[in-house]
Amino acid sequence: MRVIHYLNQFFGGLGGEEKAGTPLETRDGAIGPGKLLEQLLGAEARLVMTLICGDNYAVENQEALIAAALERIRACKADLFVAG
């Protein structure tokens, strides 16, 4: 199963409030808490991508964020999307 994980800027390792305006970024594989998530999902699951976005950017640009995230999810052919 191909999994994509969405994290905010803090849990994605970008920083705190000073990075809250960061637009959507993509990283290959598991980042931060995604490493534990991958273990918990078991051998059948592989966390193929992590999406990271600043909290303030997400609130102020919801439509653009959703469109960009869906584009990446579809392109990656993910079976599961986990936010948080």
Residue ranges and their predicted role:
Residues 1-84:
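Metallocofactor- and cofactor-centric catalytic cores in central/energy metabolism, strongly enriched
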